[in-house]
């Protein structure tokens, strides 16, 4: 393993989209009370990819990925690989359609985290490095102080945000019906140690989200960008 892969994000106990191998943080409120400020971002429906000085990685960091849907990202990496140093950029690769089709994508890769050795960088630093390498970040939904927050208020806010359509427009790939966003990711707005990841990042996923199967990689489809949708309408 060249570098450590992205940690497993635990679900909120009220997240309905858990699967058999998912983990739930039943003591999430104890963790959140140790955090000063939370940032809630949209959970995008794609593949977790990492850009580091050693290559482009998918979930496994045993070896760089060579999948066809990362070709464009690997070409981009060639341009920035010598400038990354110890910084590892993590983002959602939306090049291939999964269980949600987005209609307003301006690009296919959105940054959600950055790591430097044993430290996960603050949200401000994530945005700084994303901008430095001319990469967009995932949609920021809300930043809020934990002071005055209660478990019930947090739950209501997370569920409310999860029931909205995606920032980039979301529909079911097969029926083309408008659907809600995949979910919401909450994280400590500050920096924290890699070993403390599970106590600083939490997620909520919509019920029955995953609709792809083991044959997905054989029949994958490229996600159109917004200007391609616009061209289709004009024609």
Regions found by a protein language model. Give the residues of each.
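Core nucleotide-handling region used for phosphoryl-transfer chemistry
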Residues: 1-235
């Amino acid at each position: 393993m060249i570098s450590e892969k992205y940690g497993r994000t635990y679900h909120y106990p009220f997240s309905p989209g858990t699967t058999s191998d998912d983990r739930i943080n039943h003591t999430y409120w104890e963790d959140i009370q140790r955090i000063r400020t939370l940032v809630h971002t949209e959970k995008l429906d794609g593949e977790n990819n990492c850009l580091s000085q050693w290559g482009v990685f998918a979930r496994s960091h045993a070896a760089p990925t060579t999948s066809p849907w990362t070709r464009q990202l690997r070409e981009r990496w060639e341009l920035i690989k010598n400038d990354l140093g110890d910084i590892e950029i993590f983002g959602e690769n939306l090049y291939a359609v999964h269980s949600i089709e987005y209609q307003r994508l301006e690009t296919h890769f959105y940054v959600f985290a950055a790591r430097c050795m044993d430290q996960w960088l603050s949200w401000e630093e994530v945005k700084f490095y994303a901008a430095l390498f001319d990469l967009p970040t995932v949609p920021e939904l809300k930043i809020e102080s934990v002071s005055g927050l209660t478990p019930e208020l947090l739950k209501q806010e997370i569920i409310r945000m999860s029931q909205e359509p995606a920032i980039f427009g979301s529909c079911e790939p097969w029926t083309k019906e408008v659907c809600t966003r995949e979910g919401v990711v909450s994280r400590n707005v500050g920096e924290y140690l890699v070993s403390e990841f599970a106590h600083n990042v939490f997620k909520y996923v919509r019920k029955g989200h995953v609709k792809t199967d083991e044959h997905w990689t054989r029949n994958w489809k490229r996600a159109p960008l917004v200007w391609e949708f616009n061209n289709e309408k004009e024609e």
